[in-house]
Amino acid sequence: MYDFLRTDKVRLPSFSTTQTIVDGINLDETLKGYRTLAVRGRETSSRNIQVHDKNSYINSTNPFLDGAILLGSNIPAKNILVEYQVSTKNYRDQTELYELLNYYINKPLVKLIFTDDLKYFYKGTLANMGEIETSLEHKGEMEFAIHDPYKYSNEIFIEKFAGSGEIKRSMLYPVALEWVEIKAKTNTDKLIIKNDSTGRRIIIDSNITSTDRIKIYFKEFLVEQNGKENISATMDITSDYEDFEINTGDVISTNIDADIELSYRERKL
């Protein structure tokens, strides 16, 4: 005789190997009856390609005009699909579960972490919620639009230089800075922070003394002097503020004698 396994009666583990964390809230642990089944859409990213047909404006049978000319390409936004299971004892519990789930996920932008990749996070917006079955135990899907296709490290890395220095950390992609702080050792009326490897510069037109600290917060577009005075208006209009990035091997310097401290998050696809 054979012992057949009743797959419809197999007890599932209380938590899956991958759990979903939204803005620091672990849904699998917080929502009684909720379980993440699978997460799809993180693995690879294809590129959007812009091409020009070689023969589009020329009526010719020349074989060298076959194909197309690549004009450019970029990595598009991606969608992450979270498949989940809900199992409750009654519909009241199920209603409360979905009320909490909506509260956690239905915001303009949420921070998504999955427990099989705890060192990194995505930023996304709930784009679609699959149709909910009218049963106490059912499966569902929620889709998040990831506008920036990269995932970012939870850890913030800090580099410190005296005068100038090279980015030693090995990174796969260039990254924007979280902030950079300059501790001046001389007086100046113009501070220039430069990535010598790319030529990008940040220019501050302000009277700075040998004891001043200038800190630039890139996401907030904020420039502080000595931790209190907002001098953002002194940033020169020719600064490469939005394009200032660093990568492995880049050399960062200033035009004055100063200590440099900068921070950033690593990013990956």
Predicted feature locations:
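Polar/acidic, low-complexity leader/linker segments enriched in S/T/G and N/D
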Residues: 1-59
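Short beta-strand and beta-hairpin "edge-sheet" elements
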Residues: 41, 110-149
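Short amphipathic beta-strand/extended segments with alternating polar/hydrophobic composition
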Residues: 14, 21-39, 121-127, 201-207, ...
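Oligomerization/assembly interface segments of phage tail-like spikes and tubes
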Residues: 63-91, 136-149, 251
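Intrinsically disordered, low-complexity segments enriched in serine, threonine, and glycine
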Residues: 152-269
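Short, acidic/charged, Gly/Pro-enriched secondary-structure junctions
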Residues: 4-9, 83-127
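Solvent-exposed loop and beta-edge segments used for protein-protein assembly and interaction
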Residues: 74-78, 104-106, 134-138, 172-176, ...
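N-terminal, charged/glycine-rich beta-strand/loop interface patches
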Residues: 56-59, 63-67, 92-99
